[in-house]
Amino acid sequence: MAKKNYIIGIDAGTTGIRTFCFNDKGKVISSAYQEFKQYYPKPGWVEHDPEEIWVKTQKLITLAIKNGKLNPKDAVAIGITNQRETSVVWDKKTGKPVYNAIVWQCRRTSDICKDLKKQSLDSNFRNKTGLVLDAYFSGTKIQWILDNVKGARDRAERGDLLFGTIDTWLLYKLTGHKEHKTDHTNASRTLLFNIQTKEWDEELCKILRVPMSMLPKAFNSKNLFGFTSNVKSIPDGIPISSLVGDQQGALFGQLCTEPGEAKNTYGTGCFLLFNVGDEFRISNQGLITTLALGPEGKTVYCLEGSVFIGGAVVQFLRDNLEFFKYSKDSEKLVKSIKTKDDIVFVPAFAGLGAPHWDQEARGAIFGLSRDTTPAQITRAALKAIALQSYELANAMEKETGKPLKFLRVDGGATSNAWLMQFQADILGTKVIRPQNVDTTVLGAAYLAGLERGFFKSVAHLRKEETKTTQFTPKMKESERKEEIDKWNLAISRVKTET
């Protein structure tokens, strides 16, 4: 077998694991994918099995290498990107989780957040972390586990338990339980990390009653985090040289490393990130401030708008309502409709994220009649993805005072051309889709490769960028306004907070 160096990229998403092998031009050699089980113990609760995630990650690394007919010994490095906020607590000695991973979409800690708001602690968290008090973030999830798993709090206070987001969990397992680390982008999503000092904050940990001994050491995303040890089918000693939250990974994967550059990712949720460089700023438009990556992987700030249910609404129609067998069939179904209707679908299954931040809002469909079809409901669901993203872009324009000249997009749902055209129409601006829409893991691979010298520089990577598909607005302004007005009315009807 001829020597062919490559980077392994692991994308530990919300619904499944993808693994990729990338060549020295940042192009995909091979990949593998598998979904994992979603657990819904109570309404609004979402969990994953951390052990299942680990087992499937090992299997898929092996499969991606096999699919590319590559030699495991030729892997130069591993980069990991992950669903952020999802929280795992495990035993330091055994490496066994004390409870399932509590997923970012889970709303079980809404009451904890409400109590903190009643104590007027919002600004304590906002000014240090850039975040709002919401069940979305990790801090209250950790508190819930410690308070609700028998003996967990005592064990944590004795220093016997560790916390990590999924990047930390996979790093810990890949290194044979040797490394307990995270990166700044994941740490910045916990409600416990001061994004100005880039350190865990003692005051916030005390408020949420999280022992600091549980927390991983935090580093820049481009960093030598450790080496593989005792992993099935791959050799010991492969460097793990990047960890990055999925949305910041996508921002870097799109090479939006300069202030003013933005991207929107359409995955389980939708996430619009706008690079603001070295400027720490608190939004007054319902956006959050978080950490991202600038030139050559330097930590910078960005504004983010987060939508909890994006592509997941298509999964809901597929799995729960059984409108179609495969997600890709949604586009064909919508294109079959020849008439207009007034159906509006607000997929607030996990509350509303930015810019509303309403934890108690729930999903609703308006405008149903006896002759409503699955195709019409599907169209309304796809429109909802674009309209929620419009709200993020609108908030971003108001916050920065700059019009959006174009929007770079990525993520699985961008393969739906009907959705992308409607997005361009509703934004009134050009939408640019790259050839490789898996830019979350591409960002992790870029960072891992830059750290090891496998890639020369960001400037070099820009030269390797491939062709794009562009969608330009075609909708009449009157029709666009009508769609937005219907959406705003529907949102006002599901909101519980003013």
From Swiss-Prot:
Alphabetized InterPro entries for the sequence: ATPase_NBD (IPR043129), Carb_kinase_FGGY (IPR000577), Carb_kinase_FGGY_CS (IPR018483), FGGY_C (IPR018485), FGGY_N (IPR018484), Glycerol_kin (IPR005999)
Residues the entry annotates as binding ATP: 14-15, 268, 311, 315, 412
Positions annotated to bind sn-glycerol 3-phosphate: 14, 84-85, 136, 246
SUPFAM superfamilies: Actin-like ATPase domain
Cysteines engaged in disulfide bonds, as pairs: none
Positions annotated to bind glycerol: 84-85, 136, 246-247
Top-level enzyme category: transferase
Alphabetical UniProt keywords: ATP-binding, Glycerol metabolism, Kinase, Nucleotide-binding, Transferase
Enzyme Commission designation: 2.7.1.30
GO biological process, one term: glycerol-3-phosphate metabolic process
Entry GO terms, CC: cytosol
Residues binding ADP: 14, 18, 268, 311, 412, 416
Pfam families: FGGY_C, FGGY_N
UniProt GO MF annotations: ATP binding; glycerol kinase activity
Substrates-to-products reaction catalysed: glycerol + ATP = sn-glycerol 3-phosphate + ADP + H(+)
Activation and inhibition: Inhibited by fructose 1,6-bisphosphate (FBP).
Pathway: Polyol metabolism; glycerol degradation via glycerol kinase pathway; sn-glycerol 3-phosphate from glycerol: step 1/1
Cross-referenced NCBIfam families: glycerol_kin, PRK00047.1
Family: Belongs to the FGGY kinase family.
Function of the protein: Key enzyme in the regulation of glycerol uptake and metabolism. Catalyzes the phosphorylation of glycerol to yield sn-glycerol 3-phosphate.
Protein name: Glycerol kinase
Gene that this sequence comes from: glpK
